[in-house]
Design a protein with these regions (language model features):
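Start-transfer (signal-anchor) and selected internal transmembrane alpha helices
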Residues: 1-36, 125, 216, 223-235, ...
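Transmembrane-helix motifs of polytopic, lipid-linked glycan transferases
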Residues: 104-128, 162, 166
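Membrane-interface transmembrane helices that cradle and orient dolichyl/undecaprenyl
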Residues: 128, 157, 167-183, 219, ...
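Short hydrophobic alpha-helices at membrane interfaces in multi-pass membrane enzymes
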Residues: 135, 173-191, 226-227
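Perimembrane helix-loop-helix junctions
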Residues: 173-178, 203-240, 297-307, 350
């Protein structure tokens, strides 16, 4: 399959010109603004527990919390510290300005997503993409993938996505400019993923460490390898020590990383069931929720030819995560779409910089991106946590006559809850997207959107216009760079 004619990856000088700075600021502001349009934060169970740790630290200087729902997070939450610590400034500022620490928590998710889109843009430029293509891919990430939905939630996965994208970006910068400051930045970004989730030791830190060693060895003539390894590894060691200390505090043993209650079922899902569920199932399949990844897969061959180390890293990250979570009993993450695959969404879009030049592929990519944006807009209009799950789960229980061993049909039963989730994952009639379309046709819309739909509709249209203007501005900037001196951009 032929690739676009311009495909050389030179050493692109990503300079802080006024035009580039304006473009980056515009991208960040647009993603942040649209993310804040919903003005809501659906905490979910995970988010509630992580927020409770934040609240306990702020009010009582303690890590202990209460879990009235499942009692699985008492007296300590089994989630990572990363999100809870990052929520502290929002809680403190909210308490200071409004007297309510929860008020400004709504800023956290959109801010993380906007930062991720910005870092993704810089990574794409560092890999040689033109400004216009980098803007387009960053906007697809922000509004055509699950990132939009998860910007209105409190989960650890968006933070991991930011960390892994930033780490790859800074390691790639180090390839061009072998100064240890970039290794330190990459190490800090990787350490953030460790603080957010323990599984990042295997799923994120290990592949990134191999990639970092590769970059350091390549630059050994200009920078001592041992010093470089120490610079990258020091933040990881600090994060690992913090996690081990937190485990000792919670469980009295640094070798215990969770509680028995948190492991209900553990790695019991048949591997092929989990893989089908994560990738293709009607209720939680990645391709169903993010169809533009099909175009990314088509582009992978060209990307592998032009950036083999990054392509191998991407495939390693994906393979590890798929194999790990395909066996997990709650592989779907009990949320909208495959939550556990969210951390890789930014980097999975990177191969699009090598999108083949055939017209039908370009048109197909545009259509897939538009479908993805439509899916995300549907997720905003008919939210999963406040509308879809509360109406669909009871319907599943009554239709399929689900009950636990004691005969209870209550969704407060772990067995009934899991069985309802499984039905929504694999039965297209109960799949979230099917139900969202049905509910939308019945006139069921999120109250905040129903009450302010003219204004929000106008703001969305304005955001779309700004996105087009950003792309056109980036396109003009690329031509300016081209005539000033070719850099091998894509």
């Amino acid at each position: 399959m032929a690739a676009s004619p311009i495909r050389r990856f030179s050493q692109p000088a990503v300079t802080a010109t006024i035009a580039t700075a304006r473009l980056e600021l515009g991208l960040f502001a647009l993603v942040l603004g649209v993310g804040l349009l919903a003005l809501r934060t659906d905490f979910g169970y995970d988010g509630q527990m992580m927020y409770k740790v934040t609240e306990s630290l702020a009010l009582r200087h303690s890590f202990q919390v209460q879990d009235p729902a499942w009692h699985a997070n008492e007296p300590y939450a089994y989630f990572g510290l990363g999100v809870s610590l990052l929520l502290l400034p929002f809680y403190g500022l909210g308490a200071l300005l409004t007297g309510d620490g929860t008020r400004l928590i709504v800023l956290y998710g959109p801010l993380v997503t906007a930062l991720t889109a910005w870092v993704l843009f810089r990574l794409l430029r560092e890999l040689g993409a033109s400004a216009s293509r980098a803007v387009a891919i960053a906007l697809i990430f922000a509004f055509g993938t699950l990132a939009w939905h998860y910007s209105t939630t409190i989960f650890s996965e968006p933070l991991v996505a930011l960390g892994v994208t930033a780490a790859i970006y800074w390691l790639r910068v180090y390839q061009r400019d072998p100064r240890r400051r970039w290794l330190l930045a990459a190490g800090v970004a990787t350490a953030i993923t460790l603080l957010a989730r323990w599984d990042s030791v295997l799923l994120i830190a290990a592949p990134l460490a191999v990639y970092a060693v590769y970059q350091i060895v390549r630059a050994r003539r200009l920078s001592p390898a041992v010093a470089g390894l120490f610079t990258f590894g020091a933040p990881l060691a600090a994060a690992l020590a913090a996690n081990l200390w937190y485990d000792w505090l919670r469980y009295g043993n640094v070798f215990t990383i969770t509680t028995k209650n948190a492991l209900e079922g553990s790695f019991t899902t048949p591997i092929w069931t989990g893989l089908y569920g994560l990738l293709l199932s009607p209720g939680a399949g990645l391709i169903i929720y993010v169809p533009v990844l099909l175009a990314s897969a088509v582009s992978l061959r060209g990307f592998y030819r032009q950036a083999r180390p990054e392509a191998v890293l991407l495939l390693s990250l994906l393979a590890l995560r798929l194999l790990f979570y395909a066996r997990w009993s709650s592989w779907d993450g009990r949320e909208w779409g495959p939550r556990y695959l969210l951390p890789l969404l930014p980097v999975l879009l990177v191969p699009l910089i090598c999108l083949p030049a055939q017209r039908w592929i370009r048109i197909g990519t545009f259509v897939l991106a538009a479908v993805g944006i439509g899916v995300e807009l549907l997720g905003q209009l008919v939210p999963y946590d406040t509308t879809v799950w509360p109406t669909t789960a009871p319907l599943v229980v009554s239709t399929l006559q689900l009950h636990d061993a004691a005969g209870s049909t209550c969704l407060c039963s772990w067995f009934v809850d899991a069985a309802a989730s499984t039905a929504m994952d694999f039965d297209i009639h109960f799949a979230p997207l099917t139900r969202q379309v049905t509910l939308l046709l019945q006139g069921t819309v999120d109250p905040s959107w129903r009450a302010a739909w003219p204004m929000r509709g106008f703001l969305l249209a304005l955001a779309a216009a700004i996105a087009v203007l950003l792309w056109r501005s980036a396109h003009r900037a690329w031509f300016t760079e081209l005539y000033a001196g070719p850099t091998g951009s894509l």
